[in-house]
Amino acid sequence: MELPSWIRVKAGDYGRIVAVREAVFAAGVHTICEEAHCPNIFSCWGEGTATFLILGDVCTRACKFCAVKTGDPRGFVDPTEPARVAEAVAKLGLRYVVITSVDRDDLPDGGASQFASVVKAVKARAPWAKVEVLTPDFGGSAEAVASVVEAGPDVYAHNLETVRRLTPLVRDRRASYDVSLRVLKMAKELGAVTKSGLMVGLGETFDEVLEALSDLRRVDVDIVTIGQYLKPRGHKRFLEVQRWVPPEEFEKYREAAEAMGFKAVVAGPLVRSSYKAHEAYLEMLRKTIGR
């Protein structure tokens, strides 16, 4: 399908882009910005923000929307990774950091302990930085979710990704709509600020998106993002875009989500779960405690 006129990526500050790339390379860490071919990479890097990808760059799952490599990481976890991520954050002086990972079904805790270690390392090395984690589902393990929350992230995010009907088509067979809701519910019950994201343009209806938003509010999610699905390049498993959702429809989703009680909503054609993450966090704070 031909790209519509509203799908346009803005360039960022070239100097900041180079600085982020150099710091990431020097630290030997991965970013989801590069691994997932995010359309906002130059905009975000130009603003001096980045989403770090931990636990390697090989995912044990094969969702049909994601460009990250799939395979068997063979249980490897790099013990130096927390310190290296923290050093990159400190070197860049980032005020808001997003930490995400590949799925690691090969690990007993799904990688939760590494998330906790990275959060603690960043907080120790860059105490000024707010930290958002974007975790996999950890197989629905309450213990894994608790270990990450207890590390003290400022936001706990886990993406629902799509509507209930399309979940078996869009996500890996080991993923579950209800398990994702349960993960978010567990994090909220432990006192975390919670966040989730949805993609549209995969064949869902408007009412199905509203139903998914309602399901997220039922587990008291604070922040939600809604963006257009863009097919990654290079692999036949990736789903085709079924529809280009116009900007005015995203505005309707935003209005509906705000009416449901979400404290911050980021919706638009190029929105991804980590896009404008700092702004969404600040908006959530303003609505929660009047800051």
UniProtKB/Swiss-Prot annotation:
Q: Reaction catalysed?
A: [[Fe-S] cluster scaffold protein carrying a second [4Fe-4S](2+) cluster] + N(6)-octanoyl-L-lysyl-[protein] + 2 oxidized [2Fe-2S]-[ferredoxin] + 2 S-adenosyl-L-methionine + 4 H(+) = [[Fe-S] cluster scaffold protein] + N(6)-[(R)-dihydrolipoyl]-L-lysyl-[protein] + 4 Fe(3+) + 2 hydrogen sulfide + 2 5'-deoxyadenosine + 2 L-methionine + 2 reduced [2Fe-2S]-[ferredoxin]
As cofactor, the record names: [4Fe-4S] cluster
Write the record's keywords in alphabetical order, separated by commas.
4Fe-4S, Cytoplasm, Iron, Iron-sulfur, Metal-binding, S-adenosyl-L-methionine, Transferase
GO MF annotations in UniProt: 4 iron, 4 sulfur cluster binding; lipoate synthase activity; metal ion binding
Q: Which GO terms describe its cellular component?
A: cytoplasm
Sites where the protein binds [4Fe-4S] cluster 2: 59, 63, 66
HAMAP family, alphabetized: Lipoyl_synth
Q: List the SMART domains.
A: Elp3 (SM00729)
Q: Which residues bind [4Fe-4S] cluster 1?
A: 33, 38, 44, 274
The UniProt entry, under Pfam families, shows: Radical_SAM
- Which cysteines are disulphide-bonded? none
This protein's superkingdom? Archaea
Question: In which compartments does the protein localize?
Answer: Cytoplasm
Similarity comment: family membership: Belongs to the radical SAM superfamily. Lipoyl synthase family.
Quote the record's cofactor note: Binds 2 [4Fe-4S] clusters per subunit. One cluster is coordinated with 3 cysteines and an exchangeable S-adenosyl-L-methionine.
Cross-referenced Gene3D superfamilies: Aldolase class I
The name of this protein is Lipoyl synthase
Report the EC code(s) recorded for this entry. Answer: 2.8.1.8
Provide the Radical SAM core domain boundaries: 45-263
Q: In which pathway does it act?
A: Protein modification; protein lipoylation via endogenous pathway; protein N(6)-(lipoyl)lysine from octanoyl-[acyl-carrier-protein]: step 2/2
What is the species listed in this Swiss-Prot or TrEMBL entry? Pyrobaculum calidifontis (strain DSM 21063 / JCM 11548 / VA1)
For this protein, the record's InterPro entries field holds:
Aldolase_TIM, Elp3/MiaA/NifB-like_rSAM, Lipoyl_synth, rSAM
